[in-house]
Amino acid sequence: MLIQDYLDICDPVLTFDRFMGEIELEKYLKNIPQHYTGRLRYDPVSMLKTVLFGFMANGYISLRELEDQCKVNLRFMYLMDHQAPSYRTFGYFVNEVLADSIEEIFQDINKKIFETEHVDLQHLYIDGSKFEANANKYSWVWKKATEKSRYRLFGKITTLFEEINEELSCTGMKLCINSEYAPEYLKEAAEQYAEVWQINEAMFVHGSGHRKTTQQRHYEKLKEYAAKLEEYVEKIKICGENRNSYSKTDHSATFMRIKTDYMGNDQLLPAYNVQVGIADEYIAVVDVNQYRSDMDCFIPLMNKFYTTYGFYPKYPVADAGYGSYNNYIFCEQHGMEKYMKFTMFKKETTDKKYHEDPFRAVNFPIGEGGIMRCPNGKSFYLQYRKNVKGNKYGRQEEVYQCEDCSGCPYAEQCKKTDKNRTVRINRELTAMHQEVIENLESIQGALLRMNRSIQAEGTFGIMKNDRWYKRIVRRGIKSVLLEVFLVSIGHNLYKYHNKQKKVAAAA
């Protein structure tokens, strides 16, 4: 009997095999190098199917588990035609063959599913979750601490240069003293110093009972400071402009605060920020970021969606972690409606006392000539405009000050200092917040918010609790992306099979 005779007609592997048979898999496998000696190669298409089915069936499957399943599991035997590649073979195939084409495979599988299921891509439910990296917990490198150490080292180098210049005053050689130094300059200075004094490192003395010469001490310090400065430069370079930390074990991982604090001390852990966009329960777009904040992940995720599907979703729905001035402007520029909550959304919509508080600047009435007045009738006048730090669209805040707060009967409720009250206002952002409230408080907005909770947060719930994928296994951003794409493909195929099974049961 054939293996398929032992399988139910609705078995996941048969659904998977029929679906994958409609996709041209050979085009992803053209870059496999040819070999002319040794044993015959395993069929690359069968290998690809086996790997993808492993992630569909298990949520996450290791290389050794793949090897074992091919020996004992009828479904994997069916896909591999009774062959059982070793875990090393699977490792080479995943890391070398699939690494460059996995995103294209994810996109093509999605397009086939979406075409079959008539998935609505105009409504995209967005959420993010921090997955702990495969890195040691106490392996942190902090960018600010490194910069402080580097500046302290600059001071030590300056002191050393002053001593050396005093020593070399009779030779005519002089080292330039600056506020900052480069490792290359210190290495060059060490070479010049060694040349002037004809230093031979083989003659250096070490240990107790030996007294180092001034030349040996200065030369060793130059070499030590150059190596230390080179180390600091490398650490800051690894962090880059957008990160404040990284792990020594996995340089791509950033230290973040994650919800699952099993250490119980509110400690930061090395992690990746995984972002997903869900459409009709399928992962339409996925991205892995090193940013701690979800706000910074929204625009890269939307651009990735556009690159894949050729348009932006009309209704991107997200929680309060995504609502920012930059993201709202991006939505306006690309024809997307504003359905992302902002930080104070819940308080604005549920706390009537806060929303209608007459002492909030946004509730101050505007009188003749556009002059803002407080509850006591005093005028507020524009003092200056201030650029908001880190805003790429040139957002400005207007700073207003009350003309006179002396003797005000509402002073205790209105202000905290003895000076005239000062308020900061961005009318454009306030108008955006009002638009978001109107959108999300409408009937359509309420339905979209409910669906986001079910679909976006539900996807991570299925991943972590039903399919037991709670932690990143690979190291390095490229390998982590490969892993997350495989998990996402497996999730979508798993969802597709379940929906097909329900349709068959209802027929």
Regions inferred by a protein language model and the residue ranges of each:
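A general alpha-helix detector
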Residues: 2, 46-52, 89
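A Lys/Arg-rich helix-loop hairpin that forms a DNA/phosphate-binding surface
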Residues: 39, 81-82
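Anion-binding and metal-coordination hotspots
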Residues: 51, 59-72, 83-507
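Basic, short loop/linker segments at the boundary and entry of helix-turn-helix/winged-helix-like folds
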Residues: 9-49, 55, 427
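Long, acidic, intrinsically disordered low-complexity segments
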Residues: 1-9
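Secretory-pathway/luminal and periplasmic proteins that interact with or process carbohydrate-rich
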Residues: 75-81
